[in-house]
């Protein structure tokens, strides 16, 4: 099927198969479609609602265009969609650090914030991490340090082709869903936060289609994280099967605490670091709840409750902050 036929299919409100979505994605990133056609296709999918098959097809395409990290060991990621507009500190990145400190091997994939206060890359840059770490170095850091951060634009340069259209559209597109699933190390284990509840099943089903071994997709009380404030809806993907459930902080042995908010980047960094050091209880608990699920999907623990206990211990004993310092120093040598 040619690209024009795919556009007509979208224009008629029909869903694409995974193979058709792959072809459309290739057409977009290879420059075979003009900006008007790209905008039309992204809008059609957004208005109708992106399907799991379309997301999976786009992810396969994105992986093909990516700069690959040659991982030699299994690793986990905590990348999410972002865009919840909640103004919270960056929990997913801090949680990745804690998970690494507690025994997981982590290849954290992330970007700067496009619309919110603070993205993963903003945090890592603020603490001194070298965002230009290349693929071989990243693989080495995962093995030797247990943590590496890979900056999305460095590893997905082809995405720059569609950036002007994405910026011009007043809504998030399928690329915001694809990014978190397109880790350049092809990780098969991941904690994935989504900003919209409607995306829970879409992303979980796409992860299953993509062959993830163990993924947990979460949306908690208006944030794309496991929430320390109230209930979190979870879709768990394990070897192709999907299970939906809800959890609350107390289910993991955690108190209900507010997720720390920040009004600027400096405050966001300070509160996240205080949480990693165990100096700000609310931040530590919120970070540890997310690290608990990262440790769970990594296979370090058999239950998120055990993961929370392990994560809190890593924070309280200073291991988590030392892991951050180690990772930053290693990225610059």
Curated annotation (Swiss-Prot):
What is the stated purpose of this protein? Catalyzes the transfer of the phosphoribosyl group of 5-phosphorylribose-1-pyrophosphate (PRPP) to anthranilate to yield N-(5'-phosphoribosyl)-anthranilate (PRA).
Task: State the similarity comment.
Answer: Belongs to the anthranilate phosphoribosyltransferase family.
Note the PANTHER family from the entry.
ANTHRANILATE PHOSPHORIBOSYLTRANSFERASE
State the species of origin: Pyrobaculum arsenaticum (strain DSM 13514 / JCM 11321 / PZ6)
Pfam families on file: Glycos_trans_3N, Glycos_transf_3
InterPro entries cross-referenced by the UniProt entry: Anthranilate_Pribosyl_Tfrase, Glycosyl_Trfase_fam3, Glycosyl_Trfase_fam3_N_dom, Glycosyl_Trfase_fam3_N_dom_sf, Nuc_phospho_transferase
Q: State how it assembles.
A: Homodimer.
Q: Which residues bind 5-phospho-alpha-D-ribose 1-diphosphate?
A: 80, 83-84, 88, 90-93, 108-116, 120
Q: Where is the signal peptide?
A: none
Residue positions binding Mg(2+) 1: 92, 225
Positions contributing to anthranilate 1 binding = 80, 111
Reaction equations catalysed: N-(5-phospho-beta-D-ribosyl)anthranilate + diphosphate = 5-phospho-alpha-D-ribose 1-diphosphate + anthranilate
Q: Its Gene Ontology biological processes?
A: L-tryptophan biosynthetic process
Protein name per UniProt? Anthranilate phosphoribosyltransferase
Q: Where, in this chain's numbering, is Mg(2+) 2 bound?
A: 224-225
Residues recorded as binding anthranilate 2, renumbered to this chain, are: 166
Q: What is its EC number?
A: 2.4.2.18
NCBIfam families tied to this protein: trpD (TIGR01245)
Q: Does the keyword Transferase apply?
A: yes
Q: Which residues cross the membrane?
A: none
> What does the record give under GO molecular function?
anthranilate phosphoribosyltransferase activity; magnesium ion binding
One GO cellular component term: cytosol
Q: What does the UniProt keyword field contain? A: Amino-acid biosynthesis, Aromatic amino acid biosynthesis, Glycosyltransferase, Magnesium, Metal-binding, Transferase, Tryptophan biosynthesis
The note describing how and how many cofactors are bound reads: Binds 2 magnesium ions per monomer.
As cofactor, the record names:
Mg(2+)
Pathway the protein contributes to: Amino-acid biosynthesis; L-tryptophan biosynthesis; L-tryptophan from chorismate: step 2/5
Which HAMAP family does this one have? TrpD
């Amino acid at each position: 099927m040619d690209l024009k036929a795919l556009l007509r299919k979208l224009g008629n409100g029909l869903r694409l198969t995974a193979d058709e979505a792959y072809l459309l994605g290739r057409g977009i990133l290879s420059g075979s479609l003009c900006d008007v056609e790209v905008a039309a296709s992204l809008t059609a999918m957004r208005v109708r609602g992106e399907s799991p098959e379309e997301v999976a097809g786009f992810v396969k395409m994105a992986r093909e265009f990516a700069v690959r990290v040659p991982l030699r060991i299994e690793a986990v990621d905590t990348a999410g969609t972002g865009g919840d507009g909640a103004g919270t500190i960056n929990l997913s990145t801090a949680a990745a650090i804690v998970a690494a400190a507690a025994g997981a091997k982590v290849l954290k994939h992330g970007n700067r914030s496009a619309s919110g206060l603070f993205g993963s890359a903003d945090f890592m840059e603020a603490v001194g991490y070298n965002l230009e770490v290349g693929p071989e170095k990243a693989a080495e850091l995962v093995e030797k340090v247990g943590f590496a951060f890979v900056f999305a634009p460095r590893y997905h340069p082809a995405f720059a082709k569609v950036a002007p259209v994405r910026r011009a559209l007043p809504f998030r597109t399928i690329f915001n869903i694809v990014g978190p699933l397109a880790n350049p190390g092809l990780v098969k284990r991941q904690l994935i936060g989504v900003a919209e509840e409607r995306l829970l099943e879409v992303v979980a089903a796409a992860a299953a289609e993509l062959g993830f071994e163990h993924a947990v997709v979460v949306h908690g009380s208006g944030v794309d994280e496991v929430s320390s404030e109230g209930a979190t809806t979870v879709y768990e993907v394990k070897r192709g099967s999907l299970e939906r459930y809800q959890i609350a902080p107390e289910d993991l042995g955690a108190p209900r605490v507010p997720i720390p908010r920040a009004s600027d980047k400096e405050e966001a960094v300070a509160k996240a670091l205080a949480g990693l050091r165990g100096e700000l209880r609310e931040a530590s608990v919120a970070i540890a709840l997310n690290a608990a699920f990262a440790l769970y999907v990594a296979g370090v623990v058999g239950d998120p409750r055990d993961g929370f206990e392990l994560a809190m211990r890593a924070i309280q004993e200073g291991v988590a902050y030392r892991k951050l310092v180690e990772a930053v120093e290693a990225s610059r040598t």
